[in-house]
């Protein structure tokens, strides 16, 4: 999933355009790189990347949970969210969750994934010069933060648990099985 998400992201960013936005409080214009307003193909690629990164993070956390001697006997269902499991894994492995530079971006990734999957908040366009929320969510700045947060989670937690995380550098060969 991580490989697929990263590939979708590479295809998406190649199609990004400069999108005018403005600061709501002041009206000062600025530009973001994001999918075009009606570019369904690029928006779909961004959605696939976001979903893939979220699934990759959740899958890795579940694997880490089963690998960690302090958690593998605990029913993971007692933790209602992936973030809850991450916090507990950090705690039992002497990782200061509060100091992790990627934690807010990872939370934002899961919030975006939830809004895409469960569609509880309608996508709206507010104002004349403001970029819609989805263009802001899928901006290159935010997408790079989401991607980095997943890779950092895997590297930080995986290394602490002596897991092979070499695939985060783009070498996915270990996942292929030949008969």
Label the model's feature ranges.
Residues 1-46, 175-178:
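Charged alpha-helical initiation segments
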Residues 1-11, 45, 126, 136-147:
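Terminal alpha-helical segments
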Residues 3, 36-51, 73, 100-107, ...:
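Short, solvent-exposed segments of well-ordered alpha helices
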Residues 42-66:
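Short, hydrophobic, well-ordered secondary-structure elements
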Residues 57-61, 113-120, 154:
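A structural signal for well-ordered alpha-helices, especially hydrophobic packing surfaces
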Residues 65-95, 125-140:
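Short, charged amphipathic alpha-helical segments flanked by flexible coils
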Residues 102-129:
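Histidine-centered, metal-coordinating catalytic motifs and their short helical/loop contexts
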Residues 127-179:
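Amphipathic, Lys/Arg-enriched alpha-helical patches that create a basic surface
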